[in-house]
Amino acid sequence: MQIVNISAYKFVTLNDRETLRPALLAECQARDLKGTVLLAPEGINIFLAGSREAIDGIVGWLRADARFADLAPKESLSDHQPFRRLLVRLKKEIITMRYPLIRPEDGRAPSLPPATLKRWLDQGHDDDGREVVMLDTRNGFEVAVGTFRDAVEYGIRKFTEFPPAIAAHKDDFAGKTVVSFCTGGIRCEKAAIHMQEIGLQHVYQLEGGILKYFEEVGADHYDGDCFVFDHRTALNAELLPAGPKQCFACRAVVTPEEQQSADYIPGQRCPHCADHQARAAT
């Protein structure tokens, strides 16, 4: 059976999280769905996988709630269930930035459709003639799997490191158009709002993130694959599982070439583990 994988989020005030959680959990369990759903005062973040009928059912159930009526999941397919279990969790934020005054529901940075971004990158500037800078808001290990050509990234280890990183480099973007991007849109949405608040003037977020870009325009101007937080590890431009795997011991991303190493034993260790051990021994 082919598995349908969806990711979706929405920034919307949720004051009934304590009652919404058990109801949503029961609906997911009844449909044998696996994955993770986060509920926070600022909204919902969804990663679920299951049969077509089950996915359509849970999306329909959510959209029956007026707050989620415009929920727009991004889909991909896989031959196997990429999640081991189902979690519906209550969190302080659906993506942790630790800047509580940033409330995307109250106003967001302009979103840029993938087709428009491709056109800007094709022509080398935006419609006003400004240089376009692609800003990767993801963690360094995600960037290593693939990113937009010539994108700026800061090698952050977690999203809470983004605000100080962008503050230190704010002047680099004077007179330029900045397009923030991430996997599915949630991090770059918060990042774009933050950049506006610190005074950057020409800021956009890539609508739907890398996955939406792949879906609508393919891999033009993008090198590599897109890291995803499930057992598929990475998706290619066709939204199919790609070659990289994640080591379950050290969490490093293992390339197809590294998987040929004698140090790679699936589920146990990888060449990065061996490197860590060698450095620890010196």
Curated annotation (Swiss-Prot):
The keyword tRNA processing applies. InterPro entries: Rhodanese-like_dom, Rhodanese-like_dom_sf, TrhO, TRHO_N. HAMAP family: TrhO (MF_00469). Belongs to the TrhO family. The active site is at residue 182. Pfam families: Rhodanese, UPF0176_N. It comes from the Bacteria. It is an enzyme of class 1 (oxidoreductase). Its EC number is 1.14.-.-. CDD domains: RHOD_YceA. Residues 128-222 form the Rhodanese domain. The keyword Oxidoreductase applies. This is tRNA uridine(34) hydroxylase. It catalyses: uridine(34) in tRNA + AH2 + O2 = 5-hydroxyuridine(34) in tRNA + A + H2O. One of its GO terms (biological process) is tRNA modification. GO terms for molecular function: oxidoreductase activity, acting on paired donors, with incorporation or reduction of molecular oxygen. Keywords: Oxidoreductase, tRNA processing. Catalyzes oxygen-dependent 5-hydroxyuridine (ho5U) modification at position 34 in tRNAs.
